[in-house]
Amino acid sequence: LGDVYKRQVYQEGIYLGYRYFETRYEDVVMGTAKAGDYNWATTVAYPFGYGDSYTTFAYSNFNVTESDDAFTVTLKVTNTGKTFSGKETVQIYFQSPYTAYDKANGIEKAAAELCGFAKTDVLAPGASETVNITVDKSELRTYDANNAKTYIVDAGDYYFTAATDSHNAVNNILAAKGYTVENTNGRMTEDGNTDLVWKWTNDTLDTTTFSTGANGTAITNLFDEADPNKSSSEPGEVTWLSPVSYTHLTL
């Protein structure tokens, strides 16, 4: 008799931690079909990136410049408290487009991805510092396992934002898309800051820039049989979590 093999399959895919909570939150705010009954405020106690401090900080003069291989984010951080000195960790998040191509080919995208961060020096009350953070363009790539079978960069609009945490980042991006607490009937937890958002547009789907490694070797699928949906013994039996339908995941 042949051996019997068993394995555990985690259906969440990329939607673990903040990538799930913030993606579903954005879908609820935007009224995306099948987002379901989900309340971010009663689900998440502290968002990814959250930190306490004895003082407060404000961001200003947000700017992003593009070079051939990277984006450079610059912003001014000011200690707005009156008593305590402190350091601030500036976090940079981006959102990539979730396109028809992605949906057709089983590619998933989170509402926000951390792509860079930097910590200021100790700032006295009222003091400021300009922070520079470099984000390599490779951060924008997504692996397409089903069609291109290599890394791609989707066509569409990419949003970059400086934020205090992942939830703040998504609210900033939602604000840049025109959403507010008022026009979403309170589905949005707070208004975002459009002054801390920059949009970059990729005109065409790119399937070549990140399709080879540093040594020139082609990057492509090697172990398709490890995917239960591509295995000859159990094809198509696993439904991965996707914003297209949250119905098979409960909290």
Segment roles from a protein language model:
Residues G2-Q8, T247-L251:
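Conserved small/polar residues in nucleotide/adenosyl-binding loops
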Residues R7-F57:
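Catalytic cores of secreted or luminal carbohydrate-active enzymes
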Residues L1-D3, L16-G17, E26-G31, S85-K87, ...:
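Acidic/polar loop patches that form or flank catalytic/metal-binding clefts of enzymes
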Residues G36-V244:
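Intrinsically disordered, low-complexity Ser/Thr/Gly-rich stretches
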